[in-house]
Amino acid sequence: MQVNPNPNKLPVELNRTSLYLGLLLTFVMGILFSSYFFN
């Protein structure tokens, strides 16, 4: 395994990206479910 020069940069960016993707997915699913149930 190769040692990264800056090991703290990549996991923080990946966690932030996955966090934003999770929030966006939850937001979209909430809109879809609300429009489906209230239609």
From Swiss-Prot:
Chain ranges passing through the membrane: 18-38
SUPFAM superfamilies: Photosystem II reaction center protein L, PsbL
Cell compartments where the protein resides: Cellular thylakoid membrane
Keywords associated with the record: Membrane, Photosynthesis, Photosystem II, Reaction center, Thylakoid, Transmembrane, Transmembrane helix
GO cellular component term, pick one: photosystem II reaction center
Disulfide linkage: none
Pfam families hit by this protein: PsbL
Record GO biological process: photosynthesis
Membrane topology of the entry: Single-pass membrane protein
Principal subcellular localisation of the protein: membrane
Function: One of the components of the core complex of photosystem II (PSII). PSII is a light-driven water:plastoquinone oxidoreductase that uses light energy to abstract electrons from H(2)O, generating O(2) and a proton gradient subsequently used for ATP formation. It consists of a core antenna complex that captures photons, and an electron transfer chain that converts photonic excitation into a charge separation. This subunit is found at the monomer-monomer interface and is required for correct PSII assembly and/or dimerization.
Subunit relationships: PSII is composed of 1 copy each of membrane proteins PsbA, PsbB, PsbC, PsbD, PsbE, PsbF, PsbH, PsbI, PsbJ, PsbK, PsbL, PsbM, PsbT, PsbX, PsbY, Psb30/Ycf12, peripheral proteins PsbO, CyanoQ (PsbQ), PsbU, PsbV and a large number of cofactors. It forms dimeric complexes.
Family: Belongs to the PsbL family.
Name the UniProt record assigns to this protein: Photosystem II reaction center protein L
